[in-house]
């Protein structure tokens, strides 16, 4: 099945319980605070029906059925790059990567489960014989068959971190009952993006020291399940599509979800009860989402560089050497992001399930590079724009007979039409000088773990002790022999988790003298 936008919008009127700010939403597809972003999801599905994009947006599976590329499995480097082109096409067609949580991103998270489902069964505690690897396989096939949007929601409420017993008293989601048919859960998942627009909630957990086993839940449930309430922040969507060409296209709506005695059948439970298993998956479940994040960041960097070129050409400063060197920063930033993507793909490896996976160290440190520098890049772009990013005529002002001539003269430049400068300014304003744009800024800083967490968690994905590949050359130059006790905790990491990392492949490269990373 290749879902249409119309089918998607009709599916949203299913009785789901959604709040946006102070308003209860009767129908996500039609309410003024949600309908624009619902339409963006409909546009996403309709992209797959465009004849000119058929080979990019769809594929024919092994059963001979054409499906959307979000379900495409990549088993070699070229197939991975084909998947990247698919993601990039969506970003370029939908507001220059301004919507980070489209269905293709959400569903990519399921790849980690389906690649090696057996540990999720064997490592379960307290539900042996009930939680089966087959549950994962069946659910992913079900989602693929119906072309669903399964939004992940993993983050739990912040607690008093000075209190060692805080996790025990957390209102975070937990199992309160198990029976022959399934489990009953209650509690809160504190952050999720676009959950109000999804078909299913993909429930997971980020390990925290002291987390009790009853809070370790990996499962799925429909958004309209009785007892589920999605509580979104207030909307920052703008109404006028001319004045706000991007901010009027919709708001993804981050929010929390309250689960009040929600029943989940065993068939939709993927794992329960084991904090040590959950400890291995803060990044590994989201590896594919993080690869997608780097693609998005590359497209965003390209957009920023392009906007800098457009605005400096239009105001006539592009030939000034000092301006050229500043524009070069933005172009170099994009090239650096692109280099991380290409290198991660080039130095990828095969997972236990046979998928070709990009090098996680390269793309995760690429994400860190973006977060470390993109604030400065935004500053450069806005500063290069001068007043053009903030002070410009509204459309009615521009069209006023008495004012138009003045505006034409004020915005006349060496290239393009005077009104083009207003169009460029509106986009820069929406992206970087509105609450809608600031929400994107905050999202980029914190989704999929913030900067310091990226570094910390990535350092747990390979051997970074003196016994590892980074220490090999240094020990040789220093004339130091390797002794016992140099191994880090990574050596003790479960083999099934290490198999999802690129560390083994990199160690072989390092030991053969090919390269360090």
UniProtKB/Swiss-Prot annotation:
Pathway: Aromatic compound metabolism; Xenobiotic degradation
Catalytic activities: 2,4,6-trichlorophenol + FADH2 + O2 = 2-chloro-6-hydroxy-1,4-benzoquinone + FAD + 2 chloride + 3 H(+); 2,4,6-trichlorophenol + FADH2 + O2 = 2,6-dichlorobenzoquinone + FAD + chloride + H2O + H(+); 2,6-dichlorobenzoquinone + H2O = 2-chloro-6-hydroxy-1,4-benzoquinone + chloride + 2 H(+)
Signal peptide segment: none
Coiled coil: none
Temperature dependence, free-text field: Optimum temperature is 33 degrees Celsius.
GO MF term set: monooxygenase activity; oxidoreductase activity, acting on the CH-CH group of donors
BP GO annotations: catabolic process
InterPro entries reported for this sequence: Acyl-CoA_Oxase/DH_mid-dom_sf (IPR046373), AcylCo_DH-like_C (IPR036250), AcylCoA_DH/oxidase_NM_dom_sf (IPR009100), HpaB/PvcC/4-BUDH (IPR004925), HpaB/PvcC/4-BUDH_C (IPR024719), HpaB/PvcC/4-BUDH_N (IPR024674)
UniProt-listed Enzyme Commission number(s): 1.14.14.173
Induction: Induced by 2,4,6-TCP and subject to catabolic repression by glutamate.
Pfam (any one): HpaB_N
Matching Gene3D superfamilies: 4-hydroxybutyryl-coa dehydratase, domain 1, Butyryl-CoA Dehydrogenase, subunit A, domain 2, Butyryl-CoA Dehydrogenase, subunit A, domain 3
SUPFAM superfamilies per record: Acyl-CoA dehydrogenase C-terminal domain-like, Acyl-CoA dehydrogenase NM domain-like
Keywords: Aromatic hydrocarbons catabolism, FAD, Flavoprotein, Monooxygenase, Oxidoreductase
Class of the enzyme per the UniProt entry, highest EC level: oxidoreductase
Result of knocking out the encoding gene: Disruption mutant cannot degrade 2,4,6-TCP. Inactivation completely prevents removal of the chlorophenol.
Family membership noted in the UniProt record: Belongs to the FADH(2)-utilizing monooxygenase family.
Function field: Involved in the degradation of 2,4,6-trichlorophenol (2,4,6-TCP). Catalyzes the conversion of 2,4,6-TCP to 6-chlorohydroxyquinol (6-CHQ). The monooxygenase oxidizes 2,4,6-TCP to 2,6-dichloroquinone (2,6-DCBQ), which remains with the enzyme and is hydrolyzed to 2-chlorohydroxyquinone. 2-chlorohydroxyquinone is chemically reduced by ascorbate and NADH to 6-chlorohydroxyquinol (6-CHQ).
Subunit and interaction comment: Homotetramer in solution.
Stated name of the protein: 2,4,6-trichlorophenol monooxygenase
